[in-house]
Amino acid sequence: MSWQVRNGWYFPLGCLLVAVAGPSGVIAFQQRTSQQSPRNASTPKLGDSKVNPIDGLRYVWIPPGSFTDGCSQGDKECFEDESPPRKVTLTRGFWLGQTEVTQAAYQKVMGYNPSVIEGPGYPADSISWVEANVYCTAIGGRLPSEAEWEYAARGGTTSARYGNLDEIAWYVHNSDFTSHPVARKKPNAYGLYDMLGNVLEWTDTWYWVQHNQENINPTGPSIAEYKELRGGGWWDNQDLVRASYRIRLETTDLDYDIGFRCAAN
């Protein structure tokens, strides 16, 4: 099968995108593609970015590496399910949305906007895991694992937050009880905005009360009752707006402080 390159994203020529009814009536997209890998793809590096031609959002390269996952040293606000901290190694780099998925992008891809707090540059909110997963699949991506999310959010730091909270995040003490347009606060060292605060972000990892003990490319349990969200939101107190904070919800749950960002291989 031949591959077409559009703005650095690989799409197989002749790919068939099929719409099917998913859970809760959501339209899902299934791609019938070859398993063949594109050839001669250059290896990206930290600082590289590209625009996805489908949703128009920018994605940044997160290189492989190791980090301490879970409760940060000296963090007195941790919950039991954030411990014990352990060294995790991600052997594969990945692309991650520079911002949370905006309402303009969501409308463009999905054809509707379920958000309660409306504005094209605001993060899409009131999004279930099912809908977030459909969106990321439709643009040729996926949701990040919880390990990928935390590694990217920390941006090479080892503390609970990657900067002064008021400078990097919208949370209950500075949000005026609403979300805000993306990328209005300072990014982390990887160039990612709003990894903490604004809206909670879905991951692709099933929640397990014991902190995952896998150390290499952890994926979590194969099935469980809840999916995991990260980052805290505009409604949360500062003790919940930390890199290691974990929250879980059912895949069809949604609220107006819940959004997401996509990853891609």
Please provide the spans of the model-predicted regions.
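N-terminal Sec-pathway targeting helices
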Residues: S2-C15
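Hydrophobic alpha-helical membrane-insertion segments, chiefly the h-region
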Residues: L17-F29
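Ser/Thr/Pro/Gly-rich low-complexity linker/stalk segments immediately outside membranes or between
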Residues: R32-S42
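GGW-centered surface loops in extracellular recognition modules
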Residues: T43-P63
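Short aromatic-cysteine micro-motif
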Residues: K50, I54-D55, F79-T157, S175-Y193, ...
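Acidic glycine-/aspartate-rich tracts in secreted/extracellular proteins
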Residues: G65, S72-G74, V101, N113, ...
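Surface-exposed recognition segments
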Residues: D75-V88, T178, L196-N265
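An exposed tryptophan-centered "aromatic clamp" motif
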Residues: N133, E148-D166, H173-N174, W202-T205, ...
